Amino acid sequence: MEIISGSQIAQEIRQKLKEKNEREGISPCLAMILVGGQKEDLHYVGLKEKAATATGGKSRLLHLPEDTSQQELMAKIAELNQDEQVDGILLQLPLPAALEEQTDEILAAIRPDKDVDGFSLVNRGRMSGDRPGFISCAALACLEVIERFFPSLAGKKAVLVGDSFDLIIPLATIMIKRACQLSVLPSYEPGLASGADILVVEKGRAGIVQAEGLAPGVLIIDAGFYWGAGGVCGNVDRAALERQGFEARLLPVPGGMGPILIAKLMENLAQAARQKR
């Protein structure tokens, strides 16, 4: 089984982007907003700060108290919208429980041309048409891997498992536009992925995906994330696939989607900076 290194792909993307930014003389600025947050949230923000620096850009972190109100948060977003030194704005999710139901409304306050995460309803809506906008970094990360093995999706059979607004829905929209034979499932069942060239599993449970029902040579993208006794794991039982000698290509958890997602965020950030010129 071929294990795909998300870290290696991300490094390639960052290096190319750094060189392009240097040639064009741009140093994009990413403003990140974190409301409250746990240790893991600070870790993810730190990874994005490092990626911005590694690609020739810079970042700001606005760390607000856990009890920040919706009005206070949206006022901070309005300030960043007007700040011409800021090219992209990222709201670290999830928000605290008191703000969680207002997530879409708060995301909508970010100017679409600075919404480098592609999370706002405006950018999500543009996906269904041909208007330019920012695509979710999770969907772009998946597409980056898929295109390395399938430059053309026409006639390929793909199965996506999940219903998320940041991965499954935008990725499905892109794949349909490229004439892919697509099935989107709410949950994973081995028989329903039979014959798939591409399998993306976001929704499920730890280790649910094994060789049963899968075609040899399938590209599997694990987009699950669970904490277990042995650390972080995903939907794919990698050990079982390796024991069985199953022929597949796997983007695993950990070390798969995460690094690529952040690298694609940096590409969106650079695009936002270019559009201001």
Curated annotation (Swiss-Prot):
GO terms under biological process: L-histidine biosynthetic process; methionine biosynthetic process; purine nucleotide biosynthetic process; tetrahydrofolate interconversion
Pfam families from the UniProt entry: THF_DHG_CYH, THF_DHG_CYH_C
Gene Ontology MF: a single term: methylenetetrahydrofolate dehydrogenase (NADP+) activity
Catalytic reaction annotation: (6R)-5,10-methylene-5,6,7,8-tetrahydrofolate + NADP(+) = (6R)-5,10-methenyltetrahydrofolate + NADPH; (6R)-5,10-methenyltetrahydrofolate + H2O = (6R)-10-formyltetrahydrofolate + H(+)
Domain of life of the native organism: Bacteria
Enzyme Commission (EC) number: 1.5.1.5, 3.5.4.9
Assigned GO CC terms: cytosol
Involved pathway(s): One-carbon metabolism; tetrahydrofolate interconversion
Entry annotated with the keyword Hydrolase: yes
Protein residues bound to NADP(+): G162, D163, S164, S187
Keywords assigned: Amino-acid biosynthesis, Histidine biosynthesis, Hydrolase, Methionine biosynthesis, Multifunctional enzyme, NADP, One-carbon metabolism, Oxidoreductase, Purine biosynthesis
PANTHER family from the UniProt entry: C-1-TETRAHYDROFOLATE SYNTHASE, CYTOPLASMIC, C-1-TETRAHYDROFOLATE SYNTHASE, CYTOPLASMIC-RELATED
Family: Belongs to the tetrahydrofolate dehydrogenase/cyclohydrolase family.
Function: Catalyzes the oxidation of 5,10-methylenetetrahydrofolate to 5,10-methenyltetrahydrofolate and then the hydrolysis of 5,10-methenyltetrahydrofolate to 10-formyltetrahydrofolate.
Subunit structure: Homodimer.
Protein's name according to its UniProt entry: Bifunctional protein FolD 1
Gene: folD1
